[in-house]
Regions:
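A short, local hydrophobic-aromatic micro-motif
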Residues: 47-48, 64, 125
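Structural motif
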Residues: 30, 50, 84-86, 101-102, ...
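Boundary-proximal intrinsically disordered activation/regulatory segments immediately upstream
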Residues: 1-53, 133-134
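A short local structural element in Rossmann-fold oxidoreductases
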Residues: 41, 75, 111
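S-adenosyl-L-methionine/SAH cofactor-binding core of RNA-modifying enzymes
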Residues: 53-96, 139-166
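RNA substrate-binding interface of SAM-dependent RNA methyltransferases
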Residues: 96-166
Length: 166
């Protein structure tokens, strides 16, 4: 089946995932491009793939065929990709480990993504996002992490409550 209308209920839901409140409500987010879709798949986060009818995938997840116009609407890129993944949010691991990186009010998505990638390189166990940090599932954060965040423990905490207990 090929979905060509933005009035389709599934597509309406996925369009809402561009906003944080709906990502939180549905506990899902979107990724764009083959690399991020594969990284989400490797992390067991990928629930569904949206692709054009003439595209092929070897990943073992449900596929929904959509028109190029739908992919363009769902995309946040200037040059949309031919594949979008619908993913479930990662469950937070309450065990923080020994090497923590505490972040307070990092609001630029690109900066947060770069910090997350760097923290992985430096062997950080957990990245703690304090109040005021940009949403981890913001599409720009996801792109700038290049999927590294899918393989790390990243949690949201109130730093005022957390720090005295460390």
């Amino acid at each position: 089946m090929l979905i060509t209308s933005c009035d389709n209920e599934k597509i309406k839901k996925y369009l809402k995932l561009k906003e944080k409140k709906y990502r939180d409500f549905y506990n899902e987010f979107l990724v764009e491009g083959e690399h991020l879709v594969v990284e989400a798949y490797r992390s067991n986060l990928l629930e569904e793939i949206l692709i054009e009818q003439d595209e092929v995938t070897i990943l073992d997840v449900p596929i929904t065929y959509v028109s190029k116009e739908i992919l363009n609407k769902l995309s946040s890129l200037e040059t949309p990709t031919h594949i979008i993944g619908v993913c479930k949010k990662k469950e937070e691991n309450s065990e923080l480990g020994n090497k923590l990186l505490l972040l307070d009010r990092v609001q630029d998505p690109g900066n947060l993504g770069t910090i997350i990638r760097s923290s992985k390189a430096f062997g950080v166990d957990t990245v703690v996002l304090g109040n005021g940090c940009v949403d981890l599932y913001n599409e720009k954060v996801i792109r700038s992490t290049q999927g590294i965040g899918f393989h790390m423990n990243i949690v949201n905490r109130d730093l005022k409550k957390l720090i005295p207990n460390l």
